[in-house]
Amino acid sequence: MLQLLVLKIEDPGCFWVIIKGCSPFLDHDVDYQKLNSAMNDFYNSTCQDIEIKPLTLEEGQVCVVYCEELKCWCRAIVKSITSSADQYLAECFLVDFAKNIPVKSKNIRVVVESFMQLPYRAKKFSLYCTKPVTLHIDFCRDSTDIVPAKKWDNAAIQYFQNLLKATTQVEARLCAVEEDTFEVYLYVTIKDEKVCVNDDLVAKNYACYMSPTKNKNLDYLEKPRLNIKSAPSFNKLNPALTLWPMFLQGKDVQGMEDSHGVNFPAQSLQHTWCKGIVGDLRPTATAQDKAVKCNMDSLRDSPKDKSEKKHHCISLKDTNKRVESSVYWPAKRGITIYADPDVPEASALSQKSNEKPLRLTEKKEYDEKNSCVKLLQFLNPDPLRADGISDLQQLQKLKGLQPPVVVLRNKIKPCLTIDSSPLSADLKKALQRNKFPGPSHTESYSWPPIARGCDVVVISHCESNPLLYLLPVLTVLQTGACYKSLPSRNGPLAVIVCPGWKKAQFIFELLGEYSMSSRPLHPVLLTIGLHKEEAKNTKLPRGCDVIVTTPYSLLRLLACQSLLFLRLCHLILDEVEVLFLEANEQMFAILDNFKKNIEVEERESAPHQIVAVGVHWNKHIEHLIKEFMNDPYIVITAMEEAALYGNVQQVVHLCLECEKTSSLLQALDFIPSQAQKTLIFTCSVAETEIVCKVVESSSIFCLKMHKEMIFNLQNVLEQWKKKLSSGSQIILALTDDCVPLLAITDATCVIHFSFPASPKVFGGRLYCMSDHFHAEQGSPAEQGDKKAKSVLLLTEKDASHAVGVLRYLERADAKVPAELYEFTAGVLEAKEDKKAGRPLCPYLKAFGFCKDKRICPDRHRINPETDLPRKLSSQALPSFGYIKIIPFYILNATNYFGRIVDKHMDLYATLNAEMNEYFKDSNKTTVEKVEKFGLYGLAEKTLFHRVQVLEVNQKEDAWALDDILVEFIDEGRTGLVTRDQLLHLPEHFHTLPPQAVEFIVCRVKPADNEIEWNPKVTRYIHHKIVGKLHDAKVILALGNTVWIDPMVHITNLSSLKTSVIDYNVRAEILSMGMGIDNPEHIEQLKKLREDAKIPACEESLSQTPPRVTGTSPAQDQDHPSEEQGGQGTPPAEDAACLQSPQPEDTGAEGGAESKTSSENQKPGGYLVFKRWLSSNR
């Protein structure tokens, strides 16, 4: 949606606006401000001596005029010219302000080409397909009728103006561009209600919808195009293949399904100012190849009529019928396997009477081709090879793309289109406005049971999209009647639990966007810290029906205000496997509370639903299903995860590449107790032949199938499908490209002789055993030898996949051989060796640990070559001692960039004074050519900085102002500047190395297993410390990073000869309840340094702590001494505790549960700086 600012209204067919926000149609506001400034400077100063006046004036001429009202020079177009006594008077239209003004010829100038680089800011808009109407009286028939008119009447214009005046927000959805006019659907927000202006004018009989005529030169962005010549089903399909028996059995051709697809010819917009429009307006995801997402008249009809259209699908036999194909899979122990029917997900055509000639032409061409096809079929019933492609490719083309499969516990009829989805009408309209392409494969199976209020578990690779559950849950919440039996009190109906604050923030924003298309839900984002008072004082707004939170925050609120959740009906678990992994106890406590509440008799008629969505299956989800769900629907579209759900036995054999064949024979069961069907997967034809020979050498019958044996497909299938007696077995060696053709689902064992190329290929192999997936974990006696088995041969060639294999086996609760652990450890060591050039892991630096080294791309070892403390001048960074620092750039609550201040020899202060002296003497020479990584000067108010160029966004014209990303090398922050702000920096200012240093406050980490600081903690610390001088003790220095503990702000009371500690940064973080103690931080870093054998650096800028005596006369009123648990400590005790040995490590790991050391208190106690810093931790 485009955000608009209306400048001028002529009528609904012509109004002028400015496009706001980040849109591909405009440059930033700052660009126009700089353009206006440059124009005024140029025409006011440069042109005083030489006035650039046009030699002639013509209508339509572009020029620059002086506007008396705006007091500035503006770009304009001459509309008309009139002559007066002494000079000409021109009526000009200001293209950036949408104003018509009279201008004297003396105030008109020739426009310089560089001032025409930016597009006109005022853009002409029109309501799309919305035309004026008038009352037509037929005297002959004595009747009246409302018919289209040529111009808008005054009442319509007045109503349109009143609408736009009363609105608080104007938005538009671009539909077409005609010459210089944008045709849009216009939306206005009035009293928190969004109204489509096009619909409103039509509903009130001020206008009507009219299809664009054929002679209009429109570039449609949404209009579907039907091009018979390009339809692959008619021209690109080999006619001899069309009526081949396999095709008639329901295996449609992919090209047939795409023959009437829609396209979006947005590339027809060639305006220079429209760069990026295609990427901005196309749907957020591509539709599946077989789906047709739009109607032919989707833009021509009123949105109210769209849902009433009848959809028609075109097939080879009848234009009003469709070919459906479905695959039946036998159900085993409550599991049903489905394949999507090969039908379009939406209608293919819906045409009006004015398109009948097109349809007749299409039908005629179709009938002609159909006759030829029947003749060819009669003459040659066997399929012909087309275009010289292989037999395997030909068959794959005939069968089409294999429909994605899904494993279900209960049968679900998928919703293949938005229209057939169980979503509310308002949500459907919102999705259509947002160009939603239609439900994905997973969404088509997930939406129906969730919208019915059932318990649902969804395991899919697309879990990161919250619309998977958000839209159907919003639909359920619209049905207010089912909640009437609930207590009439304040409290949420639905709670969405996310693994961290960042995901919760994302879902909350998405919820806010789509809840506008439903009744008011008043959603709330809850992140509650460790303070009990915070949970007790939390108040929900009246009418709050949805809460988005984390497990720890929710449990704290439950502990203090459990009555708030008496109305809770829907519990949604986002990234369920992560929730159970990182907050297992908290999750089961939440589930127990939910189960206890819904078992109350008064709530029997109210809905109770648990929706769990994740990427991976694990044992905790199985426990969730058994203990807390009622006959849930289970939807799994990731086949490798379905194998875990189906309890497929996972076995890994480690061997050398040269020993694979012997390991294969060891994996085979030569004397099975039950009938055994085994598949051996290979990666090539040669490998298939070798495997077949090896197996047959052991006197076991072995079939084979690869692309060169496609002629034998039917024979192989017949052999495979034969019923086996007990104790007998059949083995088939095949390549992965044969899997879709064979469609095997009854294998009992799969051996991966070659490593699968991707998880999808791995899942496809395991799906061949789907008939033997077990829905419930039975006893070994019940399962016996019926349990499906997967055997993976892992060699040294597959070393890069060892970590992923180990993770999969751990989730499967499989027996992991000790050799695999050793092998994986060696692989990880080798990976770490390759990371020598990578930066040190930011989490390792900030907290002393990395959450998952196995997948982290950064380095986790200290490199003696690159991690030696950097030199700021003649001395290196201090590795110990006391320093004074000024933080300038705050990355997060504990990570800052700033400068070390040396009171004995501050080289930067000297440099800064010299720079100020140099630049104030008119030495501000701007840079003509900017080089990447070049060093320049930059003026900010009265200060001058050294900056290094990181990126240059260079524009074509010299007058254009470049966007340049620079780093302030003495402060650590980055910023965007323009070329004219950069100053030439003499070489003698380059000699001092960059003074910006990274500081990390030690021994504190985010609470609740988070790895990133909550933004409100970062904001608080930023406001507290930025730009202020602090005292700190250095613990460690590596590269350009200094670890400090503590970091305090001190006020010197010279009159009392006393120093007062205002605050300790670490204590401030702990006092907010969002952080906990991290005593292992320093020890882990020092251990890494010892392992790297980096010698202690003797060169140091360390300072001795100041000699101070006395205490603070009064406690800081802004920071009362109050422990996080609510208990206060007298100043004397505070000082005593801080001076005792190891005063800050004696607390519990929570660090904020009122049992930690006194340093975890609110700051404000009376501390002597020397003793406090010298205390032995």
Swiss-Prot record:
CDD domains membership: Tudor_TDRD12_rpt1 (cd20434), Tudor_TDRD12_rpt2 (cd20435)
Enzyme class: hydrolase
Region (Disordered): 1098-1177
Motif (DEAH box): 574-577
Reactions that this protein is recorded to catalyse: ATP + H2O = ADP + phosphate + H(+)
GO molecular function: ATP binding; ATP hydrolysis activity; nucleic acid binding; RNA helicase activity
EC number: 3.6.4.13
InterPro entries assigned to the protein according to its UniProt record, in alphabetical order: DEAD/DEAH_box_helicase_dom, P-loop_NTPase, SNase_OB-fold_sf, Tudor, Tudor_TDRD12_rpt1
Record's compositionally biased regions (Polar residues): 1100-1115
Domain Helicase ATP-binding: 447-635
Domain Tudor: residue ranges: 56-118, 900-999
Assembly behavior: Component of a mRNP complex containing PIWIL2, TDRD1 and piRNAs. Component of the PET complex, at least composed of EXD1, PIWIL2, TDRD12 and piRNAs.
The protein's name in its UniProt record: Putative ATP-dependent RNA helicase TDRD12
Organism: Homo sapiens
Lineage summary: Eukaryota, Metazoa, Chordata, Craniata, Vertebrata
